[in-house]
Amino acid sequence: MAKPAYKVADISLAEFGRKEIVLAENEMPGLMACRQKYGPLKILKGARIAGCLHMTIQTAVLIETLIELGAEVQWSSCNIFSTQDHAAAAMAKAGVPVYAWKGETDEEYMWCIRQTLIFPDGKPLNMILDDGGDLTNLVHAEHPELLKEIRGLSEETTTGVHNLYKMFREGRLGMPAINVNDSVTKSKFDNLYGCRESLLDGIKRATDVMIAGKVCVVAGYGDVGKGCAQALRGSGGRVLITEIDPINALQAAMEGYEVTTMEEASKEAQIFVTTTGCTDIIMGEHFLNMKDDSIVCNIGHFDCEINVTWLQENAVEKVNIKPQVDRYRLANGNHIILLAEGRLVNLGCAMGHSSFVMSNSFTNQVLAQIELWTNREQYAIGVHVLPKKLDEEVAALHLDKLGVKLTKLSARQAEYLNLPAEGPYKPEHYRY
């Protein structure tokens, strides 16, 4: 049986999606510069890219950039709640085989990913663009015969990168991979500034809660946690941090946050945000400690940070307030308000990150795909990062939009610093 040309929630939303894509393009200068620079060269001609990344308006601009560069593209979303149905419809209407809709079941989610493996002409994928590792894991586990044709993969997020390093250590990685997440222009921008705005958008749309004056817990103080803590503090919240890493804990303390354990924080706070990418962060004993109508949400990639299963099995009652907002009544009489079923709150309850910051991340994705497609022989099987020079190029492409005037090194200054006047300006180990 032939697979469908696409599967989306409502193709009639395509016109609405196209209007928003036009707006987003103006906010994504990095991707538009890639089209201008590489489009005429069709530098990705012959690439058959299977993408598994949140099917949003911003992702639509990424998809059409890859196509403009000569690639064939098929797409699924990497989260059951993150698809923006008008974006998916616009891509389907434009002829892109896209398999994504908001509110997929877990079974439908895996079905969607499987549809992207074989292209309409019967040929398999030869490139992967992933977010979280589900597509990568599926190919390795179920279709190892496809690995020999795949030139490489680029991975978007922290969770997926951890998965890649684990696969490589265990000898299971079958292709070169570029870790896009650890490009400075991704992790220090998308993870921090993106979450700083989109977290509050998700919480506010879901609950209309006043942040000011409330005690808020942020679990984890990496780049995502830093952005979330800044957002909550900026709205007047009193922010507590939980951490396992003494360096991150010290950073948080010296920014003026109280650093404590979830056992202690769960007795005091009213809003909980997990950002760790780890499992078992908020457990049954923590729910039992919480105040009535505590709000609990996650902004890490997978839904394993909050023990939703415990809530489902132990709550006396569950009331769905509206899509992705559930109120659980516990045996002690208190209620827990869970957002997006413990999945990404900024995409489940709002629209995700803004276009401008996603232009940083997605420009890195485009450059990673170009690197792997055109210079495959330079990349052994393993996990790689983009060169510093490309990282700086991504940043430079976004300066004009913000009216930034960059100082230029003189020849004497460049000689004094022993740097090329045109960069790169920092060593690979520099942390920013």
Swiss-Prot record:
This is Adenosylhomocysteinase. Substrate binds at residues 56, 131, 156, 186, 190. Pathway: Amino-acid biosynthesis; L-homocysteine biosynthesis; L-homocysteine from S-adenosyl-L-homocysteine: step 1/1. It catalyses: S-adenosyl-L-homocysteine + H2O = L-homocysteine + adenosine. SUPFAM superfamilies: Formate/glycerate dehydrogenase catalytic domain-like (SSF52283), NAD(P)-binding Rossmann-fold domains (SSF51735). Keywords: Hydrolase, NAD, One-carbon metabolism. Adenosylhomocysteine is a competitive inhibitor of S-adenosyl-L-methionine-dependent methyl transferase reactions; therefore adenosylhomocysteinase may play a key role in the control of methylations via regulation of the intracellular concentration of adenosylhomocysteine. It comes from the Eukaryota. It comes from Anopheles gambiae. The keyword Metal-binding does not apply. Its EC number is 3.13.2.1. NCBIfam families: ahcY, PRK05476.2-3.
